[in-house]
Amino acid sequence: AMIRSNGEYCGIAYLMPANDPSVSGIGFSVTAWSCLSSQTFAHELGHNMGCCHAPNDGGGCTTGGLFPQSVGHRFNGSSGTQYRTVMAYSPGARIDNFSNPLVNFDNAPTGIAPSGSDAGRDNAGSIVLTNQARRAMYKV
């Protein structure tokens, strides 16, 4: 990951294309210094770990992430407030969580468990599944 002083975009990153250490050459992202407080850094690293935006968000990540469930999530909490996880675009107040059906925020799940033909929304689970390949990508 690289932090730059300025630029046209807050961030840009390669989407991890395979759960394999051979893709280590594209484990790269760039975030603008002025966007660090807006969760852009975590969002761009999410792409490097195979995570995609919420369905229908676009933004160069329209076909989903590394796995079918590797997508962000937008949801309404019990207070009626709409929220979005780290990988989802607005609308909604962004929370500091990757989509995960096992974690609640405002008494609502921050992801969707797979069910029938719906693969669900679970970027946190996808990050766990890519752990071995990521170790090879992020060498110091």
Over which residues does each language-model region extend?
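Extracellular (secreted or membrane-anchored) zinc-dependent metallopeptidases
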Residues: 1-140
